[in-house]
């Protein structure tokens, strides 16, 4: 291992220690999923996600929705968050509108809420960098 590789690895480990200095005190709680939001009925009425998801396991159905949405939503890291962060508003703003890109947080929000509307357990997960010099993060949907 050369000096640059050693220094990079050192910085990653420094970041791990820095980001995990302390833990939130308190007791563990169960994750709760709300699949009964009134807006979900509007979402399924306006967009054909039930037909797109089709039949099969939750994962198979979620993958079909993902494959449908992916080419229809443009990614933009410069999206400023001016649209309400819910699937209905974000789809109205960005679906099939390449000039209206949204960031990963909002793309994950759309997939999460569509899945919940379909009765598929889903949640957003944020990935934070371990390097103390990297301020970028990423958000995905976990099924």
Feature locations, PLM:
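Long, hydrophobic/aromatic-enriched structural stretches that serve as scaffold segments
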Residues: 68, 72-75, 106-111, 118
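A structural signal for well-ordered alpha-helical segments within the folded catalytic domains
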Residues: 63, 102-113
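Short His-Asn-centered micro-motif
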Residues: 100-104, 125-127
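Short, contiguous, pocket-lining structural segments
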Residues: 57, 103-107, 133
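Hydrophobic/aromatic-rich core segments of domains that either
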Residues: 109-143
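Secondary-structure boundary elements
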Residues: 2-102
């Amino acid at each position: 291992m050369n000096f640059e590789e050693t220094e990079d690895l050192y910085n990653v480990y420094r970041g791990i220690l820095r980001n995990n200095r302390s833990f939130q005190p308190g007791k563990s709680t169960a994750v709760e999923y709300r699949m009964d939001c009134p807006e979900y009925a509007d979402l399924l009425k306006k967009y054909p996600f039930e037909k797109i998801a089709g039949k099969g396991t939750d994962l198979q159905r979620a993958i079909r929705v993902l494959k449908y949405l992916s080419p229809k939503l443009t990614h933009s890291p410069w999206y400023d968050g001016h649209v309400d962060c819910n699937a209905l508003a974000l789809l109205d703003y960005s679906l099939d509108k390449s000039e209206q890109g949204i960031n990963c947080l909002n793309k994950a929000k759309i997939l999460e809420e569509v899945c919940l509307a379909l009765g598929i357990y889903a949640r957003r997960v944020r990935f934070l960098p371990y390097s103390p010099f990297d301020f970028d993060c990423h958000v995905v949907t976990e099924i």
